[in-house]
């Protein structure tokens, strides 16, 4: 009898069964739109230029993907690919952060520069990549862009910069801030020879980048809904003690207030730039 009681109260053993409703998705296979939360196949999204199929939101696009989508196949020649940043101020853990971003993005800095053709029209180009230190502008970013502009000036080519940046890189202090002036001087020399500079702002374009070469194009373009501005929204509201419009610092707001020439959908990027380059070439003739 007592044996029977102990048998009944014997602790039951359970087997953990995997919850089959939790679908495992290998990393890199799927992507979620940050605006509407729609989940899409990464490959299909890339084929659509990282534009959401559902809400048309323009997601971040890395530098090489943008170059591949824009430049004629096989024409892009990269400049200064392996110029690498140093730690001039001995900022703590800066080298480790650089190495981490390098491993994650497979690029050496936050900008890719070079030249090639867009529908047959030769042009110099710099494309910032926000995955690397949030696209911040340090000494190497400034140096690479400056060298590319100088090359375009020497070769008598127009120049295009795609900006995507959180501003100057704080780990490099005043050395990063001086890149604002250095790039602007190179652009001014480029302009003095009668050459065209197109600034193409993408999300986000803020801080020192927005206050220098991002906003001084002969033609200023931007992608839809891009955040463009110098100081943050909250800082401005606290300073002026007023609530700002909901669309403040968006590409559309800047267009309405005369600070942009056109807001360009990513799928129209190549067509619009081709038209501008074509008109510029005719003007030279």
Curated annotation (Swiss-Prot):
InterPro entries: AcCoA_carboxyl_beta, Acetyl_CoA_COase_Trfase_b_su, ClpP/crotonase-like_dom_sf, COA_CT_N, Znf-ACC. It is found in: Cytoplasm. The keyword Nucleotide-binding applies. It comes from the Bacteria. Zn(2+) binds at residues 33, 36, 52, 55. Keywords: ATP-binding, Cytoplasm, Fatty acid biosynthesis, Fatty acid metabolism, Lipid biosynthesis, Lipid metabolism, Metal-binding, Nucleotide-binding, Transferase, Zinc, Zinc-finger. Pathway: Lipid metabolism; malonyl-CoA biosynthesis; malonyl-CoA from acetyl-CoA: step 1/1. Gene3D superfamilies: 2-enoyl-CoA Hydratase, Chain A, domain 1. Binds 1 zinc ion per subunit. Its EC number is 2.1.3.15. Its cofactor is Zn(2+). PANTHER family: ACETYL-COENZYME A CARBOXYLASE CARBOXYL TRANSFERASE SUBUNIT BETA, CHLOROPLASTIC (PTHR42995:SF5). Component of the acetyl coenzyme A carboxylase (ACC) complex. Biotin carboxylase (BC) catalyzes the carboxylation of biotin on its carrier protein (BCCP) and then the CO(2) group is transferred by the transcarboxylase to acetyl-CoA to form malonyl-CoA. Acetyl-CoA carboxylase is a heterohexamer composed of biotin carboxyl carrier protein (AccB), biotin carboxylase (AccC) and two subunits each of ACCase subunit alpha (AccA) and ACCase subunit beta (AccD). This is Acetyl-coenzyme A carboxylase carboxyl transferase subunit beta. The gene is accD.
